[in-house]
Regions:
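Solvent-exposed interaction patches of small proteins and small membrane subunits
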Residues: 1-129
Length: 129
């Protein structure tokens, strides 16, 4: 399991690095916004899956099969500090995955820049410890 967890961590770290690169671009271009949204979705997917695998590796998790239950369990066991922000991230990921509205996309990109990227890095810091 440790090897699988290490691989999942690396996938998350790579996704996070690519998201950070995209966030340095000018968001006045809708193609850039689309790219950031896609990278946010992918980074979020990698994040909740690495949390799930970490919890399983620790013998903590049996019931979490989906992002919401994994986030709740990760918050309960202090992998993440702010479960509400992670739930908000999940809901925003769902919004961007199931429909497209330019104004919503730009607002989510702003949240990624202002809040979500910080939470991803806090998770990375926890996993690196």
């Amino acid at each position: 399991m440790a090897k699988k967890l290490d691989e999942r961590k690396e996938d998350f770290y790579k996704a996070l690095k690519r998201l950070e690169e995209a966030l340095k671009k000018d968001i006045s271009d809708d193609i850039i916004v689309d790219g950031i949204i896609q990278r946010f979705e992918f980074t979020f997917e990698q994040a909740w899956k690495v949390m799930k695998l970490y919890l399983e590796d620790q013998g903590i998790l049996d019931e979490a099969l989906a992002p919401r239950s994994t986030i709740r369990c990760a918050f309960k066991h202090k992998l993440i500090n702010d479960g509400d922000i992670w739930i908000e991230m999940m809901l925003d990921r769902n919004r961007t995955s199931h429909m497209y509205d330019e104004e919503t996309a730009v607002n989510i990109v702003k949240l990624v820049k202002e809040k979500y990227i910080i939470e991803f890095y806090k998770l990375k810091e926890f996993l690196d410890y």
